[in-house]
Structures are given as structure tokens and as C-alpha cells.
């Protein structure tokens, strides 16, 4: 028997029609007032839906938080900024400071072996009195000796300053050597210039070990290291010249050790006493 024969409505009168539109759970979601089971078990008064505003009115509110415990906006970016200021920024500032001071220190060391106006006395001593040939190898050995004297003071700095200044000074030295190889000797091949730089690096390492051993030992050991590196083991070297160079080394190492850390980092008082003046000074 059909519904029409019984003259029954399609659904009970108290059953609400489905509503399309926005709800508290999201846009355009179909909602029904109740299911067919609710029609059987509940009366129409019980199926009345509560207003969300009424529900919020009776819902207990959380107490306000202490503003001192609430994270500020963009707290992640603020943490990154604090980490940068605490760990990274001081190292970068130290690196820039070391680079600038190392440039001045290297200029003081490199001009001792070049005919500069303010270093003609040292230039004449190394190339005329010592009779060292004016070659790139001789310039490298003389400059390396002055840089080693600077490194003896750099080793006494705090850990971070020691690493920054030592790296900056060595980097400046090898950059200048590479520039001289390309510019003065017209060697444009990176492979050939790299081979020369590797050989010079090995010579530098050996010279540092020799000078360190001589500085901790006697004057005879230091003179032997100077004779082996600067004079390439020549048998006709005057012993008086070796004595003058040993006095020059010890006097300049002593002068730099007397400088305070701040003065040395800022480059104050960083200069070399010429060898001939060192021979007339008693340490």
C-alpha cells in the first residue's frame, strides 16, 4: 500500500527540513536537526538545537595569563636574532677586525724586503750586506722571518683572537704571493701557480719549526736555522752577520711581547727595529 492511499505526509511535521549554508563547523556543510532515530526516541521539544551564543555564554572562560610568561610575537625570529648576537656576530666582528689589523701587520713585514722609503736601511742590509740575491725566493724567506716574529706574539693572544689573527695574516701572505706570481712573472696558469704555492707552504712549515726550535734553544741553534733558510746553506756566510740577525730576532720578539693585548690587536707599536740598530742594542 502506498503512502498516497493512506493520505500520509512524506515526513512528520515536526521533522525539520535539511538546511544548506554556513554552520559553526564550516561553510557549506549540510546539517540535519536530527536523525530518523531521534524522531522515534525524542520529542520535538528535545530536538530543538541550542544557540552557539548561548553555549558560549555558559562556557567557563580561562583566566588571563601572566603577560610576563606570554611569548612575544615572532618569538622564533627573536631567538634566532639573540643566537646571532651572542655567538655569530662577535666572531664576525673579530674576523673583520683581525683582517684590517693583519693587513697593516703584513705591510710592515713585507716592506722590509722591498725598496720602500721608510725601510731602505733594512733593504740594504738584507740584499747588500748579507749578499742575498734579489729573487722571489729571497723575498719570501725574509718576509716569512718577519711574519714568524709576529706569530710569536699572536700565540699569546686569547683563543679566538689567536685563531682569527693567525688565519688572517697567513691568508694575506699567500694572497700577496699569488698576486706577485701572476703579475710579476706572468704565470697565468692556476695549476702552475698552485704548484709553486704548495712548495712555498712546505718551506714555510719547515722554517717555522726551525725558528721555534732555535727560539726555545740556544743562539747557535737559531743561527743554524737562519743560515739554512735565508742563506740556503752557503759556506761563505759571515758569522758576524748571523750574530746580527739573531740579535735582531730576539730584540723584536721581546719588544712585541711587551705590548699589551689591546695595543697589539689595534696595531699600536707593531713595527720592526732594523737589524743594524738591533746589533747596537742590548736586550
Swiss-Prot record:
Compositionally skewed regions (Basic and acidic residues) per UniProt: 45-58
InterPro entries assigned to the protein according to its UniProt record, in alphabetical order: Ubiq_cyt_c_chap (IPR021150), Ubiqinol_cyt_c_chaperone_CPB3 (IPR007129)
GO annotation (BP), single: mitochondrial respiratory chain complex III assembly
Family stated for the protein in its record: Belongs to the CBP3 family.
Region feature Disordered, mapped onto this chain: 43-70
Gene name of this polypeptide: cbp3
Domain of life: Eukaryota
Gene Ontology cellular-component annotations: mitochondrial inner membrane; mitochondrion
The organism of origin for this protein: Schizosaccharomyces pombe (strain 972 / ATCC 24843)
Protein name: CBP3-like protein
Annotated Pfam families: Ubiq_cyt_C_chap (PF03981)
Amino acid at each position: 500500500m502506498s503512502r498516497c492511499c493512506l493520505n500520509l505526509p512524506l515526513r512528520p511535521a515536526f521533522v525539520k527540513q535539511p538546511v544548506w549554508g554556513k554552520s559553526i563547523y564550516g561553510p557549506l556543510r549540510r546539517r540535519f536537526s536530527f536523525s530518523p532515530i531521534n524522531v522515534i526516541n525524542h520529542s520535538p521539544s528535545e530536538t530543538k538545537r541550542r544557540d552557539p551564543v548561548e553555549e558560549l555564554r555558559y562556557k567557563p572562560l580561562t583566566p588571563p595569563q601572566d603577560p610576563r610568561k606570554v611569548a612575544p610575537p615572532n618569538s622564533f625570529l627573536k631567538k634566532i636574532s639573540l643566537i646571532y648576537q651572542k655567538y655569530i656576530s662577535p666572531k664576525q666582528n673579530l674576523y673583520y677586525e683581525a683582517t684590517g689589523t693583519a693587513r697593516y701587520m703584513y705591510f710592515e713585514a713585507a716592506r722590509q724586503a722591498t725598496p720602500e722609503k721608510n725601510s731602505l736601511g733594512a733593504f740594504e742590509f738584507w740584499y747588500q750586506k748579507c749578499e742575498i740575491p734579489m729573487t722571489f725566493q729571497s723575498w719570501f724567506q725574509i718576509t716569512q722571518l718577519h711574519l714568524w716574529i709576529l706569530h710569536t706574539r699572536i700565540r699569546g693572544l686569547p683563543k679566538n683572537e689567536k685563531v682569527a689573527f693567525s688565519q688572517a695574516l697567513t691568508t694575506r701572505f699567500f694572497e700577496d704571493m699569488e698576486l706577485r706570481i701572476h703579475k710579476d712573472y706572468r704565470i697565468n696558469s692556476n695549476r702552475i701557480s698552485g704548484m709553486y704555492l704548495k712548495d712555498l707552504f712546505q718551506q714555510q712549515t719547515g722554517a717555522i719549526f726551525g725558528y721555534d726550535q732555535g727560539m726555545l734553544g740556544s743562539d747557535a741553534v737559531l743561527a743554524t736555522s737562519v743560515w739554512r733558510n735565508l742563506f740556503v746553506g752557503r759556506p761563505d756566510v759571515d758569522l758576524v752577520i748571523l750574530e746580527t740577525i739573531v740579535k735582531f730576532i730576539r730584540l723584536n720578539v721581546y719588544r712585541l711581547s711587551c705590548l699589551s693585548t689591546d695595543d697589539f690587536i689595534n696595531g699600536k707599536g707593531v713595527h720592526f727595529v732594523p737589524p743594524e740598530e738591533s746589533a747596537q742594542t742590548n736586550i
